[in-house]
A protein has these predicted regions:
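Extended, compositionally biased low-complexity polar/Lys-Gly-rich tracts
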Residues: 22-34, 102, 199-205, 214
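Solvent-exposed alpha-helices and their adjacent loops that cap or buttress functional pockets
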Residues: 36, 50-51, 96-98, 127-129
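Metal-dependent peptidase/peptidase-like ectodomains
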Residues: 1-9, 19, 52, 107-229
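Short coil/turn segments at beta-strand junctions that form active-site/ligand-binding loops
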Residues: 55, 100, 132
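Soluble metallo-hydrolase cores and metallopeptidase-like ectodomains found primarily
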Residues: 1-70, 85, 89-91
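Alpha-helical metal-binding/catalytic segments enriched in His/Glu/Asp
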Residues: 43, 59, 63-114, 119
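Short, contiguous, pocket-lining structural segments
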Residues: 36-37, 71-75, 150, 206
Length: 229
């Protein structure tokens, strides 16, 4: 490329001078693919409900990764595994059961196009249409602010949760910390909402994680939750 020299943070590690463009450039790529066919696995566990066993709340996170996966997906998967451990131990100690059935899922082959979760949804579509109440997804997590998107039928419910859970860094509620950031937002709508109310608004779900099969294929109420930036 031609044009001005790129600032230091924009430069890569090649022994060339990085420019910002515009300008003519030709690039030659040599691509190699692995076409091996290998099995992939979903791991499913159920805790049957005491009153409404045929109503399912499904909790999922994928277990595959491009590399070592410490951030994506392990930072989300360990949370789901801890939820399952706590609930199972509590049930053993007290005899407690959830009113609805909880389905815990660790999905395979998310990175290759949501294969594990979508294939499971397609295989069990009739049963899911009858029984699935909601799907709750996590993926990669980090430090920062609570972020959630989902079906807006869940917004009032999640607003109550966000106002009752303490943020692990600041000691205020998770909703209050999000509001403190939004009050300084450059987006006028976000800032205006924060000035008027502490209500936690769910963003719309896009695509790219394992809620897609549930939400976009079958129209099941869904949510994606995480912490970050």
């Amino acid at each position: 490329l031609e044009g001005p020299v790129a600032p230091p943070r924009w430069r890569g590690g090649l022994p060339i001078t990085y420019h910002m463009g515009p300008g003519p450039a030709m690039l030659h790529l040599k691509l190699e693919f692995n076409w091996d066919i290998v099995p992939t696995y979903n791991i499913i566990a159920k805790m049957e409900g005491s009153e409404f066993p045929d109503q399912w709340v499904i909790r999922g996170n994928h277990h595959d990764a491009w590399v070592h996966g410490a951030a994506d997906p392990i930072s989300g998967l360990v949370v789901e595994m801890e939820e399952a451990r706590i609930l199972s131990e509590y049930a053993k100690e007290t005899g407690w059961r959830p009113k609805r059935t909880i389905v815990f899922a660790a999905w395979g082959s998310e990175e290759q196009g949501l294969i594990g979760s979508v294939e499971w949804v397609e295989e069990h579509a009739l049963e899911l249409r009858e029984k699935a109440v909601a799907y709750i997804n996590t993926d990669g997590n980090g430090a920062g602010f609570l972020g959630a998107g989902g079906s807006h039928t869940l917004e009032t419910f999640f607003d109550e949760i966000a106002h009752s859970v303490t943020d692990p860094i600041q000691g205020m509620t998770a909703a209050e910390r999000v509001r403190s950031r939004n009050l300084m937002s450059s987006n006028s709508l976000t800032r205006s909402r924060a000035e008027k109310s502490s209500h936690y608004y769910l963003s719309a779900l896009g695509s790219g994680s394992d809620y897609s099969g549930f939400f976009q294929h079958l129209g099941i109420t869904s949510m994606n939750i995480g912490y970050g930036g």
